[in-house]
Amino acid sequence: MTQFDHDRLLIIDFGSQVTQLIARRLRELNVFCEIHPFQNVTDAFLADFAPKAVIFSGGPASVIDANSPRPPASVFELGVPILGICYGQQVMMQMLGGMVERGHGTAEFGRAYVTPQGDRPELLNGWFLDGREQVWMSHGDHVSRIAPGFEVYGTSPNAPFAITADLARNFFAVQFHPEVHHTPNGKTLYENFVRLAGFTGDWTMDAYREQAIAEIRAQVGDGKVICALSGGVDSSVAAVLIHEAIGEQLTCVFVDHGLLRKNEAQEVVTMFREHYNLPLIHADETELFLSALDGQSDPETKRKIIGKLFIDVFEAKAKEIGGADFLAQGTLYPDVIESVSFSGGPSVTIKSHHNVGGLPEKMGMKLVEPLRELFKDEVRALGHELGLPASFIGRHPFPGPGLAIRCPGEITRPKLEILREADAVYIDQIRKYGLYDEIWQAYVAILPVRTVGVMGDGRTYDYACALRAVTSVDGMTADYYPFTHEFLGETATRIINEVQGINRVTYDITSKPPGTIEWE
């Protein structure tokens, strides 16, 4: 089964940071969807894509500005349901004859409450059962006059046209973001939309597996693939999937860059050689990486150095096996959106990612990224589909640059050893308390400061470290984990007593946003 066997929903991306969450919510409903940037959606594209429904994403622009993003007018002539979200509502209203105005005292950012107005359309089945709905707003401009044919079905204090619809054409538009978790009943709205559009929910991880295998075979042909295997869930699922697709045409390379956790290198090599029978080259390049990182403290510089050296190593290993045509990576959606908009649209860059921003434009191999359109929980579901053990699939994410981005400032061997030991104690504590599976990601960061302490009768002047643990569904947003004081106190005591070089332990309670999950 390929993607063309499915009815497809088109998401037109206007640059919102949460466009990928729209796709995530639809995938939870087993609906096949694709995200495409507005500038790529032409009349010819629409005719070829033939969507069964269309969603307009939000975005940072103002429809009032000249040359603001907009879809082709022909999208409204397709005869399919359309849902506009935030900026998507505003562009729909303006293009269909309504009016949008600048927000002067009417902007809404954050939690808001929408109350119903008029009869309840099918889109709102299951809504307003308690009289109002909590939603997440993020808009400066606002609709001041709805387009002909539209009616109002929900209002908020600063958005009198919070929910509008033209029921004759199945056009719907909302000012809020139903895709984020801060709109608790948002999933119900999407369920209603895809149901009225006629989707049957036939897209599953089994279907994705078959589709991905077919696409890998079509892309690779008779070529050789070298896979960047880190031992993390992402690269491991990618490796097993690619191996299922092309067998011995795949060679995995595990690079020990000297930035791995305690005992990690040997565990990875043993696991994949003995249990998964994958062709594996173990390249210990500790000296190469640490020498290149010596004296570097800027996080972007560190990421770029690591990314470049990864490519250098893979190209060298490819030559050793007689040449490779493709480089495989376990790149995911959040990796890409945090580097630059996945769609190439106007989304704002947050940070470069080692799988993306660190790659030279003219590398010697083409990329194979079979997980590029998946979120972490989908990768785990795919791993289960591929037969990987649950204990492995449930491992916390670990970044490609490894401990380099958990060591703010300059990287030294002594600091890395301290960090490894502290991290091992912390994770042991989390497992001891039975909390590992409740947490999305947990780690220790060693801080670039020393603090004065007293141990016994002596003065110490050692490093401080920060514990980090977050809960998340998809990595796009995250909250800190609410450990008990007992846990934090016991963990701090263990680290200070068992890890030479640390005399102060802190706990990072920053959510994402405004912070990111990793320190760098």
UniProtKB/Swiss-Prot annotation:
Q: Which residues form the Glutamine amidotransferase type-1 domain?
A: 8-202
Q: Does the keyword Ligase apply?
A: yes
User: What GO CC terms are in its UniProt record?
Assistant: cytosol
A molecular function GO annotation: GMP synthase activity
Extract the Pfam families matched here: GATase, GMP_synt_C, tRNA_Me_trans
Q: Which PANTHER family match?
A: GMP SYNTHASE [GLUTAMINE-HYDROLYZING], GMP SYNTHASE-RELATED
Q: What does this protein do?
A: Catalyzes the synthesis of GMP from XMP.
Name used for this protein in its record: GMP synthase [glutamine-hydrolyzing]
* The encoding gene: guaA
